[in-house]
A protein has these predicted regions:
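Intrinsically disordered, low-complexity terminal regulatory regions
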Residues: 1-125, 129-150, 155-157, 164-166, ...
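Proline- and acidic/polar-enriched loop/turn elements at helix boundaries
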Residues: 146, 257-258
Length: 284
């Protein structure tokens, strides 16, 4: 990185913020939060802060169900992207990676960039970045190279997808990061697709574990595609629904789900069809 690069990037960030583009650009809005709300300097050179081993252990314990549910999906995602110089990170709701997958030969590089367990990747600490900005905006996104707030992070490309728990609350983020200069737009699109599918598998497994005593039934969205999962007890009461199921059924994501007859929620014939085939509809 040449000497003019830090000054150029910092000037570009400040110019975009000053121009008022934050109202039209989610990226500039994130830059503005980083600068004005969190008082960060895009030219800052301090490496990411890290938790102590004891603090990291506590963070892992707090999201133990998510960690357990994520293992298989993280393994499969890493098998798909690891050979291309990417690492896979699972971060908690505070933006702290609590688990990762990576090639041993790349460990030193990723550690030096802070793409490691225990690092603090919230927007408050690291400005615009995949994990932190995903947590704020609660949507899948990619922060590519100079879209990062800090100049020192502009060699990174990070794709992040939010993960919601069995109560439809934001639980963490699944992230695939790379510091390779040859990452193409086409490859980034494939990574985004693979990461999104892995996040869905984690959510489904987390939901099944939380409602292991219930039937887990697929719902249909308005487009005929899978709308999410609901948990139905022995009395045919819906006692749980994933975030996507709530959206498909018109249930506010922030509202506590009270037990409701499946027939009332799904509709008469639809409910009977779903419940009659409940065991067939269970996600394996």
């Amino acid at each position: 990185m040449n000497g003019s690069m830090p000054r150029h990037h910092a000037a570009r960030v400040e110019a975009a913020i000053a121009s008022g583009q934050a109202a039209r650009s989610a990226l500039v809005a994130s830059w503005r939060r980083s600068s004005r709300l969190h008082h960060l300097d895009p030219g800052g050179r301090t490496s990411p802060m890290r938790l102590t081993e004891a603090e990291l252990h506590q963070a892992r314990e707090r999201i133990a169900p998510l960690l357990a549910a994520a293992q298989g999906a993280m393994d499969r995602l890493y098998q798909a992207v690891g050979a291309s110089g990417c690492c896979v990170l699972l971060a908690d709701g505070e933006g702290v990676p609590v688990d990762r997958r990576g090639t041993a030969a790349d460990d030193a590089t990723f550690q030096s960039w802070g793409l490691w367990t225990g690092a603090l990747w919230s927007e408050e600490h690291e400005g615009t970045n995949g994990i932190g900005t995903c947590l704020v905006e609660q949507r899948p996104l990619t922060i590519d190279r100079d879209q990062h707030f800090f100049t020192r992070n502009t060699l990174l490309s990070c794709t992040a997808v939010p993960i919601y728990d069995h109560e439809a609350a934001l639980a963490g983020v699944l992230d695939v990061s790379s510091c390779r200069a040859d990452r193409t737009d086409a490859f980034s699109s494939l990574i985004a697709l693979a990461t999104g599918e892995a996040a869905k598998r984690i959510e489904a497994d987390l939901f099944r574990r939380a409602f292991s005593h219930a039937r887990i039934v697929l719902t249909q969205g308005a487009d005929g595609q899978c709308g999410g999962l609901i948990a139905v007890d022995a009395d045919d009461l819906v006692i749980g629904a994933t975030r996507s199921a709530r959206a498909a059924l018109g249930i506010a994501p922030g509202r506590a789900l009270q037990p409701v007859p499946a027939a009332d929620l799904l509709g008469g014939d639809t409910a009977r069809d779903h419940l009659a085939g409940g065991q067939r509809a269970v996600v394996q």
